[in-house]
Amino acid sequence: MKKLNQFMCIGAVGLLSVGLSAQGTDTQQPMQGDKKPMQGEMQHAKANMKAEQVIASWKPAPKMAAEAMIKKYGEPAEVTSMRIIWHNNGPWKYTEIMNQETEHNFPMPHKDAMHQAVNYKVDPSKADDILEYDGSIILNRTAGMIGAICDKEPANFLAVNLAHEVATGKKSVDEARKQYAMSIETMMKEKKMDKYTSGLIFEPPANAGFTDAPFGAMGTNGKK
């Protein structure tokens, strides 16, 4: 009889343990109406938080540019402590913003911070004129790109558009500089955008690179 009572007690304890275990398992499971965030959503939220955290302590010019581009184009493709980059955003091949400011006094004092570029076939004979018109123009003949570094996207549109007109002979260096100053004044004082600051006035080619050709003994591996 004593053994029977012990067996019954052990069985009762076992059943109680199973019941508590099952109850605990049920409470850990999400309710039917709950929805777990998708992996992509979690990564996007993490990237968004990271970009905002990174630029929070940046210098004024790059921080302002970064905030404007995030608002317009969404999250950058690359984020580091010193730079953020978008690829193929809008009409641009890329947009790069670094946490640094470069003093630039044309046409009025400001700080360059944002580099944006497009595909473009650069004519070497026009390079001097383009750079004389605006020193913040960036030319890369090998990759086939032209870009500008300024503090605002409309100013980069303006810089690249007028560089195109200098390259094509539509405007002289002086004419391009005068037009640049006029367009900036219209944008800053009248809060209006003209054709030069609203977007690109030309269609960038799909591929404009110039790979050049082998030269000298090194280029031909010693073969004649």
Residue map of PLM features:
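N-terminal propeptides/low-complexity segments immediately following signal peptides
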Residues: 24-43
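Non-cytosolic coordination micro-motifs
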Residues: 44, 50-94, 98-224
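Ubiquitous "structural anchor" signal
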Residues: 19-22, 177
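Bacterial N-terminal signal peptides
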Residues: 9-19
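Bacterial N-terminal signal peptides that target proteins for export
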Residues: 1-10
